[in-house]
């Protein structure tokens, strides 16, 4: 099996067989790069345990052990690339950390990482040159050279592992603490590495790549990076007799530690591999600079069952030596390496240069490092007075800066303020119910580089400023236990109970009742310290946690079963200002209701009083901050002239509404309340002061309304919004209304301007609701599919909306709403009528939207038709005159119920004349006349009385009058006949009037048509030759009575030759020949056969004429046989001549049709078709 790997930018292949390779010319014929193995050499010939090594050029060949791989793996510059075919192997009994997460893995900027990775790949001395290498270790007697510890200075045999020849001065993604190395060596320069002076990162990358390479028979001592005498392939006495030569790195290792590689020791590092792949005996792991600390060296430093004093600052992990819960089923010891301070360089976003610096809160991982100075991790054993004072002053400076510079004010709402107190342990949050950390990912498209360096469900506890809890202590003198617990910060929040996964929003939170007093205390602490009436900072609360005594403390509301655990995580620590804590003490002292003020909407008469107090405090505390804000969750009885601003709004809120909370025009009541427990369900459904029900996330929510602010808070589009997540990735879910004009540039890897990249709640879907793996590299395969996924789409698996969450105020530059724009761009292939609520009128006025509605209305249910009808009824007249909207109205006249037709007819009433004269309204009138009842028809037609001639002569109105004549009973049309008196000739010669005259002749009674026909007979000669009047005469010949036809024929007789050569009259002559009686037809034919036109007969003249030849053809068709014989004899002398004329050929073609059979009495009248006689 060949697995490709990148070596020095050359593609090579690993060979499964490890044959012995011999060197030629003093150097081995390396398998790397050549991809070949000498035939005849069996892999069984090598001794178990031989490590890959190679002989450097020029070295004596006597000391070169034969090996399967001819070159040391770590000396080759590997490009940092995961094996594409590697898949997760399951998590039944291993550590279940999320893929890609590592506790000590830090993040650096994308540009820097790309540069360093490429530098490693290009570090090879030549594209084809093979670097010198040496063996890492081999089997030999440990007592031969004595015990040697790992990573002692200058232990490399040759300069390959000597002084660094890499251009980097520090390892990638590692910042060293001054004066201390990773392995206890205080001289950083003495730690040597193949790729850098202090980290050995290049080797760790080699491990990372080689860990997934196929190595069926690799020595088992490499299992989990431990050098041991264990052998996966040897059992019984053979295993006990196997001896190994100590590695140069571990020559001073204690003998008792050599045999200490048991399962517990091998699994000392509880994190497993960084990508979550299960390690086995085939893994190649331990080299200098490995990402996993060596178990042996950890054992040397801290012992096999103790945890480093540097882990999590001063706090120990209570769960480290306990059997884990169902989330982490492994019963192994969970010992973590010492945490190293790692900083993140400035993000590649357009933040200002003078960003506010902040400490890494509690985790020892620098989440942010903003170009100012690096905040090293400080161990805080106690809160001194100087720290309290300095923190208060620093917070006051930030508040003053926000007041003076409004554009920086938003930084405080996203947690970009320094953490003054960081004695908290990790907090394990409650994930989304049923969510699996291995199948969920909270980014819209790709994995953002801002991952927490901690496992799933755990995030730094610096999100809660302890000063707020300490301030709340003054108001809770009767609850000293809970206050002490909060001030000490010894909190470890867990998911739910130890044996229970999060419940659904409608289920009771069972198993969370025992600690009622602690929960009540916690409710006061969070109510006062975290959700005061002070606006500004983003809040986060756990669902439950263990206090210092081991008691399970459940967050307020969660015990009542009002909401399931929905994780709300920001990408930065979220702090409370000291002013907020002071305000909590002032407003909520000795009062539980005051403690929860600002956190939940007040229930009862005290609500307005609390809101007035909040507004009064805000006016005093922030007179110049340009943040006209209410309490964090807003008020539900705000005045119309008030403004609100919320952390979750992309700018100042709309007047008279709240951007987040329980306001009367807002329904996102329990966005964070779902984590608190709230007064609502998982995502709202809270009631306003009026008591009316509002659907969650309705279109009235200000989250989806455009903000008048031109510059939102820094980082707001991807740190705010609905922070639902079951993954430790940063919350970066912009709302549909957020465009580039509303905020600074979002993270480059996230799509923030499409409704299709909105919120991903609980998992990563491919747009059709199907989940797929969130394993490293999987996002690239589904990146395009993830971009089309949307929390607001109609196929959402978690919260199927009743309709798409679009707001009518969200207008695109084209003038269309975002929903219509997305529909026109084919982003909603399964759009339904119910998804268009609020947009029916707009869609009806769009070409594609109107066609969509028309098609749906034909097959829609009565309920769906009524939904559409309720919206278009108010804009009925507007749609009737719209180029596309009129078709929707017509569809309702065609497929609507009688009540709907009656309602639309009522809308037409009083507007018949203007609609009849309008280009599109006239179509609606015509469709209405076809659909409504007789009484409604008569009522509608009467509006045209007095305006008949105006409508008849109008290009649109004439169609309405024609439809009236066709559909309405003749008795109701008497006013139209009266209007035509004395105007028949004029109207007959009118392009539109002639049509109305024909409709009258077709549908009206004889009594009504008689006066019209009398006027027509008086002007027959003129009308016959008129371009429009001839149609009226033809219509009388076709549909009139016999008397009327005879009168017209009499007018034509004697003028057949002349009228037949007229462009318009020739049509009337043809109709006379066709519809006249046999006697009248004979007179007309004899007239052309007997009449002479100069030297030739009239028939010859007519055969050559462009119009009269059609009359001759019609006579041949309609003539009696005797007359037809006469016509043939008259035509025969002119056959040769007719071939010279274009129109004469038409006559010859007609003759061929009837007489090609060579009638015996006529003989051969027509020659061959080729013209030869």
UniProtKB/Swiss-Prot annotation:
Pumilio repeat spans: 835-870, 871-906, 907-942, 943-978, 979-1014, 1015-1050, 1051-1086, 1087-1129, 1130-1167
Species of the source: Xenopus laevis (African clawed frog)
UniProt KW keywords: Cytoplasm, Phosphoprotein, Repeat, RNA-binding, Translation regulation
PROSITE patterns: PUM (PS50302), PUM_HD (PS50303)
Chain positions covered by the region annotation Uracil-nucleotide binding in RNA target: 886-890, 1030-1034, 1109-1113
Cellular component aspect of the GO annotation: cytoplasm; cytosol; P-body
Region (Guanine-nucleotide binding in RNA target): 1066-1070
Composition bias, Polar residues: 287-296, 493-518, 623-633
Protein name, UniProt field: Pumilio homolog 2
Region span, Non-specific-nucleotide binding in RNA target: 958-962
Region listing for Disordered, in residue ranges: 41-68, 265-296, 480-518, 592-662, 730-759
GO molecular function terms listed in the Swiss-Prot or TrEMBL record: mRNA 3'-UTR binding
Domain spans labelled PUM-HD: 815-1155
Subunit organization: Component of a complex with papd4, sympk, tacc3, parn, dazl and cpeb1.
Low complexity: bias regions: 480-492, 606-622, 634-657
């Amino acid at each position: 099996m060949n697995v490709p790997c990148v070596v020095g930018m050359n593609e090579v292949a690993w060979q499964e067989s490890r044959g012995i390779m011999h060197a030629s010319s003093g150097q081995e014929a390396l398998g790397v790069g050549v991809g070949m193995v000498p035939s005849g050499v069996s892999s069984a010939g090598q001794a178990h345990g031989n490590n890959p090594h190679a002989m450097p050029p020029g070295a004596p060949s006597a000391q070169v052990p034969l090996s399967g791989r001819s070159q040391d793996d770590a000396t080759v510059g590997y490009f940092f690339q995961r094996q594409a075919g590697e898949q997760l192997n399951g998590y039944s009994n291993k550590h279940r950390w999320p893929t890609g997460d590592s506790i000590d893995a830090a993040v650096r900027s994308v540009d820097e990482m790309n540069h360093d990775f490429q530098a490693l790949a290009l570090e090879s001395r030549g594209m084809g040159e093979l670097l010198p290498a040496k063996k890492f270790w081999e089997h030999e007697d440990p007592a031969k050279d004595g015990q040697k510890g790992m990573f002692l200075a200058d232990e490399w045999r040759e300069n390959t592992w000597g002084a660094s020849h890499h251009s980097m001065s520090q390892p990638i993604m590692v910042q060293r603490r001054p004066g201390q190395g990773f392995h206890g060596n205080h001289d950083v320069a003495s730690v040597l590495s193949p790729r850098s002076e202090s980290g050995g990162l290049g080797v760790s990358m080699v491990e990372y790549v080689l860990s997934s390479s196929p190595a069926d028979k690799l020595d088992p001592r490499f299992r989990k990076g431990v050098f041991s005498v264990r052998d996966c392939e040897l059992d019984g006495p053979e295993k006990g007799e196997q001896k190994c030569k100590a590695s140069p790195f571990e020559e001073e290792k204690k003998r008792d530690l050599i045999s200490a590689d048991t399962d517990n020791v091998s699994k000392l590092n509880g994190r497993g591999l960084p990508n979550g792949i299960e390690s086995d005996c085939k893994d190649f792991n331990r080299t200098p600079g490995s990402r996993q600390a060596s178990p042996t060296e950890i054992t040397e430093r801290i012992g096999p069952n103790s945890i480093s004093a540097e882990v999590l600052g001063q706090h120990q992990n209570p769960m480290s030596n306990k059997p884990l819960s169902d989330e982490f089923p492994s019963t192994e010891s969970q010992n973590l390496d010492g945490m190293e301070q790692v900083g993140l360089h400035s993000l590649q976003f357009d933040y200002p240069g003078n960003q506010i610096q902040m400490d890494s809160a509690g985790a020892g991982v620098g989440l942010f490092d903003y170009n100012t100075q690096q905040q090293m991790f400080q161990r805080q054993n106690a809160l001194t007075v100087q720290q309290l004072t300095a923190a208060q002053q620093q917070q006051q400076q930030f508040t003053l800066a926000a007041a003076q510079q409004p554009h920086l004010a938003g930084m405080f709402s996203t947690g970009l303020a320094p953490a003054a107190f960081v004695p908290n342990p990790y907090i394990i949050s409650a994930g989304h119910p049923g969510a699996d950390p291995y199948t969920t990912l909270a980014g819209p498209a790709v994995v953002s580089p801002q991952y927490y360096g901690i496992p799933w469900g755990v995030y730094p506890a610096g999100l809660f400023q302890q000063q707020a809890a300490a301030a709340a202590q003054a108001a809770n003198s009767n609850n000293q236990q809970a206050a002490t617990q909060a001030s000490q910060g010894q909190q470890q929040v867990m998911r739910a109970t130890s044996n229970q996964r999060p419940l659904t929003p409608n289920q009771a939170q069972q198993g969370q009742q025992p600690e009622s007093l602690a929960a009540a205390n916690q409710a006061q602490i969070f109510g006062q310290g975290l959700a005061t009436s002070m606006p500004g900072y983003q809040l986060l609360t756990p669902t439950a946690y263990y206090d210092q005594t081991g008691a399970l403390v459940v967050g307020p509301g969660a015990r009542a079963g009002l909401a399931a655990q929905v994780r709300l995580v920001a990408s930065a620590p979220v702090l409370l200002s000291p002013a907020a804590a002071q305000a909590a003490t002032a407003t909520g002292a000795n009062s539980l209701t005051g403690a929860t003020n600002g956190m939940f909407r007040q229930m009862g008469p005290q609500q307005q009083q609390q809101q007035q107090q909040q507004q009064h405090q805000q006016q005093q505390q922030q007179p110049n901050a340009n943040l006209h804000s209410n309490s964090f969750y807003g008020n539900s009885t705000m005045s119309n002239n008030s403004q609100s601003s919320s952390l979750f709004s992309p700018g100042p809120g709309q007047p008279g509404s709240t951007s987040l909370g329980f306001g009367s025009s807002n329904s996102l009541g329990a966005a964070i309340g779902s984590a608190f427990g709230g007064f609502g369900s998982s995502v709202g459904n809270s009631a306003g002061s009026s008591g009316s029900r509002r659907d969650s996330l309705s279109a009235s929510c200000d989250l989806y309304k455009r903000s008048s602010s031109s510059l939102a808070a820094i980082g707001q589009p991807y740190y705010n919004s609905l922070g639902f997540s079951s993954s430790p990735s940063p919350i970066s879910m912009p709302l549909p209304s957020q465009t580039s004009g509303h905020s600074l540039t979002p993270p480059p890897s996230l799509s923030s301007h499409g409704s299709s990249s909105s919120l991903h709640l609980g998992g990563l879907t491919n747009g059709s609701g199907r989940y797929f793996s969130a394993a490293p590299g999987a996002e690239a395969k589904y990146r395009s599919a993830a971009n089309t996924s949307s929390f607001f789409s109609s196929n959402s698996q978690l919260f199927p909306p009743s309709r798409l969450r679009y707001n009518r105020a969200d207008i695109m530059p084209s003038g269309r709403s975002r929903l219509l724009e997305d529909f026109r761009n084919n982003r909603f292939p399964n759009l339904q009528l119910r998804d268009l609520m609020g947009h029916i009128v707009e869609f009806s006025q769009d070409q594609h939207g109107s066609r969509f509605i028309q098609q749906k209305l034909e097959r829609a249910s009565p309920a769906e038709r009524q939904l559409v009808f309720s919206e278009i009824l108010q804009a009925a007249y507007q749609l009737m005159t719209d180029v596309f909207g009129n078709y929707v109205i017509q569809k309702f006249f065609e497929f609507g119920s009688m009540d709907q037709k009656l309602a639309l007819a009522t809308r037409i009433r009083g507007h018949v004349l203007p609609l009849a004269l309008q280009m599109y309204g006239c179509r609606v009138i015509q469709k209405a006349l076809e659909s409504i009842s007789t009484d409604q028809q008569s009522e509608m037609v009467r509006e045209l009385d007095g305006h008949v001639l105006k409508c008849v002569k109008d290009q649109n109105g004439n169609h309405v009058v024609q439809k009236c004549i066709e559909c309405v009973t003749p008795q109701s049309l008497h006013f139209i006949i009266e209007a035509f008196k004395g105007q028949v000739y004029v109207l007959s010669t009118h392009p539109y009037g002639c049509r109305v005259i024909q409709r009258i002749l077709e549908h009206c009674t004889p009594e009504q048509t008689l006066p019209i026909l009398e006027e027509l007979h008086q002007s027959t000669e003129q009308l016959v030759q008129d371009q429009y009047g001839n149609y009226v005469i033809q219509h009388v010949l076709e549909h009139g009575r016999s008397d009327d036809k005879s009168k017209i024929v009499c007018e034509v007789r004697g003028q057949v030759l002349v009228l037949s050569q007229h462009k318009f009259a020739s049509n009337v002559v043809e109709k006379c020949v066709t519809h006249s009686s046999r006697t009248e037809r004979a007179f007309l034919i004899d007239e052309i056969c007997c009449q002479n036109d100069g030297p030739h007969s009239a028939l010859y003249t007519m055969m050559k004429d462009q119009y009269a030849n059609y009359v001759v053809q019609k006579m041949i068709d309609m003539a009696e046989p005797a007359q037809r014989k006469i016509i043939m004899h008259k035509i025969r002398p002119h056959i040769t001549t007719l071939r010279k004329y274009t129109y004469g050929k038409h006559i010859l073609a007609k003759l061929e049709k009837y007489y090609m059979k060579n009638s015996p009495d006529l003989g051969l009248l027509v020659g061959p078709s080729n013209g030869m006689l």
